[in-house]
A protein has these predicted regions:
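Structural signature for solvent-exposed beta-strand/loop edge elements and short helix-capping sites
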Residues: 159-205, 209-213
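N-terminal amphipathic/hydrophobic interface segments
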Residues: 196, 228-230
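Hydrophobic lipid-interacting interfaces of membrane-associated proteins
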Residues: 215-218
């Protein structure tokens, strides 16, 4: 079915109402959320003497885009439900369809608005929010969360091709790896093996201090060279952060940094790569939901109801929260190795796309 795609007053009208309502709802809800968040964290702020400037500029200025993007599906759905229900209640949609505009053609400005919001959300996800998360997470670590001793156990990495590092345990308090081992392998043959009672990272000189070390080099003629000593300094393609993985850290990587991290983790055989893959797929899956929830919202609210817009808004909020919970629940399939991150994180979009198609077909034409 062909229809005229040239911009009309109707398109400008719907796009303006969509975008305006979206941002008004966004900032109203964010204001309420900030009030509740302050009341929840005020004791931490006072107890740990957080400066007012840090609270405002380091935390809440960076908290707003994070929260705004995380709940953007909810805001999109409520926006579409609200102003479309209002249009239906005022018989505007009936008037539009009576003028010869098809239901499909009426959807064009909705899809265009959803595309603008999706592009805005994607830009935030890939480049802006990761930088703002650095300050937000640093603030939470310093003033909100309880400080605990970070200990990594049985850490094993391929730090470079043919070079493997192992530590029985690692303490972030003193940057020390215990029972440290470094192996170098070439052509499936062990070339050398270094063991040390401890490996301490010197933050000033950026070197690892291997204490009570033992070095064994394996030669092709089956003769071994053995050395030992109290301490030796060396540089390794290994950082303190590699020993203790904080899943929140992936939120601070922009698109290109996250791809580099994933490549590095895959090369190392790092099991924590699942967190990075979840983050990467989530950044693309979430903006795409703007299209799905927009179609669902129009299909649900374009018909005039006797009860007014209350039922539509209630149903919209319920479906939006169901989608968000489904997005979070789908991550469990990755943690349990049931599904790959790409399938698990896109599963809610697939399911809700089917629902959107069914609702759209049932909507008034």
């Amino acid at each position: 079915m062909e229809f005229d795609l040239r911009p009309k007053k109707l398109d400008v009208y719907i796009v303006t109402k969509f975008i305006t309502t979206f941002f008004v709802a966004l900032f109203l809800i964010i204001g309420i959320v900030i009030i509740f968040d302050v009341s929840e964290k005020i004791d931490n702020f006072v107890e740990k003497e957080a400066p007012l400037r840090a609270i405002v500029f380091d935390y809440y200025v960076n908290f707003v885009p994070y929260f705004m993007n995380m709940f953007s599906p909810l805001f999109v759905f409520i926006t579409v439900i609200f102003f479309t229900s209002k249009m239906a209640s005022d018989s505007e949609i009936v008037a539009i369809l009576s003028c010869g505009v098809s239901f499909h053609r009426m959807m064009v400005p909705y899809i265009f608005s959803a595309a603008l919001i999706a592009l805005f959300s994607l830009t935030l996800n890939l480049f802006i929010i990761p930088d703002s998360n650095k300050e937000r997470i640093a603030f939470e670590t310093k003033y909100v969360k309880d400080k605990t001793k970070n200990v990594g156990r049985n850490v094993h990495y391929q730090i470079s091709p043919g070079e493997f590092a192992f530590a029985e345990s690692f303490s972030s308090w003193n940057n020390t790896a215990y029972r440290f081992t470094l192996e170098r392998i070439e052509d499936n043959r062990l070339i050398s093996k270094i063991t040390a009672e401890t490996a301490v990272y010197d933050t000033t000189r950026k070197v690892w201090q291997l204490k009570k070390y033992f070095i064994r080099e394996y030669n092709e003629d089956l003769t071994d060279r053995i050395r030992s000593g109290k301490q030796i300094d060396t540089t390794l393609a290994l950082s303190v952060d590699d020993f203790y993985w904080n899943p929140e850290s992936v939120e601070t990587y922009n698109y290109f940094e996250l791809n580099d991290l994933i490549d590095l983790q895959i090369m190392r055989g790092d099991a924590n790569v699942k967190y990075s893959l979840i983050q990467k797929n989530n950044r693309f899956a979430l903006p795409f939901s703007a299209f799905i929830l927009t179609i669902m919202g129009v299909a649900l609210s374009s018909k005039k109801r006797r009860g007014g817009i209350g039922w539509n808004i209630g149903a919209g909020i319920a479906l939006a929260f169901t989608y968000i919970l489904f997005m979070k629940f789908s991550e469990m399939f990755v943690y349990t190795d049931t599904l790959s991150p790409a399938i698990a994180l896109w599963l809610p979009n697939i399911v809700f796309t089917v629902i959107a198609i069914v609702l759209y077909r049932l909507a008034p034409k």
